[in-house]
Amino acid sequence: MENKFTMKAFRLLFVLLLVCSTVSAQSWEQPYADRGFTVQDTVICGRRAVFVVPKEANGRWIARPAFIGAFAQVDDALLELGWSFGLLDLMDEYATPDAQEAFTAFCDYGHQRYGLSRKVVLEGLSRGGWFSLVYAENQPDRVYKLYLDAPLCDLTKFRNEHIQKAAEQWEAAGIPEAKFRTYARDHFARIKGLPIIVVYGAADPTVPFEQQFGTFDLSGCRDLSIIGKTGVGHHPHSLSPCDTIVRFLAKPVWL
């Protein structure tokens, strides 16, 4: 009797999890599909990959390495302007060489399948800021602009569990912990040639601006806009309305 009850409970739990995951997937996809966008949810290099492409796409696009559907007002505004949106889920990876190679493969796929530009706007929210900065530093020719929102820029000043996990991942990739711990200080100079917009909450206790992006030497930045939100914490990300961010990302880059 107990075994039958256990099996029934297990089956019910499985069905509930399946239904919940389906509803969760549909909850962000359906509005885009209803508006006529092409939505693809696939797997690239073993990671979840998402593309949202308007009918009259202009080839420009914005992509993020984490947080599908979260604080998406900038993405939505750009979609209305003919931009496309992409995500490669690297949430629990910390910009290891393998993760960066996967993102390059993701960008190549978007270019080949949808005609998206070889240069992408990287959207780094919170932990996504770390990946965006490392990738832009290593692949500046593949990045059009950076939109960083409450960005984690120096992992050594974050929570211990994340520092440990990141250090383990980098060491497994053959990168010594000493280099990982000085990476933010030593390796972000090359991003100064990219247009960058940074939005942050002035009362953010999780990723304080003055301990993160605010520690960088910003002299020599080609095009930099920093917007602080008085009295705002780590959330909400973005701005309301988000026109200032959209204008910065959409304006031409003059070489």
Segment roles from a protein language model:
Residues 210-255:
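C-terminal catalytic histidine-bearing segment of alpha/beta-hydrolase fold enzymes
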Residues 58-67:
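Short beta-strand element of the alpha/beta-hydrolase
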Residues 156-220:
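The feature captures the conserved acid-bearing segment of alpha/beta-hydrolase catalytic domains
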Residues 70-86:
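Short amphipathic alpha-helix adjacent to the substrate-entry channel of hydrolases
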Residues 119-172:
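Primarily recognizes the serine-hydrolase "nucleophile elbow" in alpha/beta-hydrolase
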Residues 26-57:
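N-terminal cap/lid segment of alpha/beta-hydrolase-fold proteins
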Residues 94-115, 134:
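Alpha/beta-hydrolase active-site loop
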Residues 11-21:
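Bacterial N-terminal signal peptides
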